[in-house]
């Protein structure tokens, strides 16, 4: 499941950053996004074009095409 498929206000864990280029991986790292991090989908725009995600007490905005590279699982 990718971050695009997440449900608002549920806690997820990022299990993989799949098939993206190095520039995007560096951008994710600059936001604190990496494998093992917990995240919560806070808001999204119409048609989920942009997503607002909480990661380590920081709110981050991601585009839909960026979120598709983040593989997540529901956190316990």
Swiss-Prot record:
Gene3D superfamilies in the record: 2.30.30.90
GO molecular function: transition metal ion binding
Entry annotated with the keyword Nucleus: no
SMART domains: FeoA
Entry-linked Pfam families: FeoA
Keywords, comma-separated and alphabetical: Ion transport, Iron, Iron transport, Transport
SUPFAM superfamilies in alphabetical order: C-terminal domain of transcriptional repressors
Gene Ontology BP, a term: iron ion transport
Free-text function comment from the UniProt entry: Might be involved in Fe(2+) ion uptake.
Entry's family note: Belongs to the FeoA family.
Protein name listed in UniProt: Putative Fe(2+) transport protein A
Organism: Helicobacter pylori (strain ATCC 700392 / 26695) (Campylobacter pylori)
């Amino acid at each position: 499941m990718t971050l695009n498929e997440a449900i608002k206000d549920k806690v997820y864990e990022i299990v993989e950053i799949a098939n993206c280029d190095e520039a995007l991986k560096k951008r994710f790292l600059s936001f604190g996004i990496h494998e093992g991090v917990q995240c919560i989908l806070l808001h999204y725009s119409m048609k989920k074009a942009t997503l607002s995600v909480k990661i380590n007490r920081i709110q981050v905005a991601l585009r839909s095409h960026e979120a598709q590279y983040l593989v997540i699982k529901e956190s316990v």
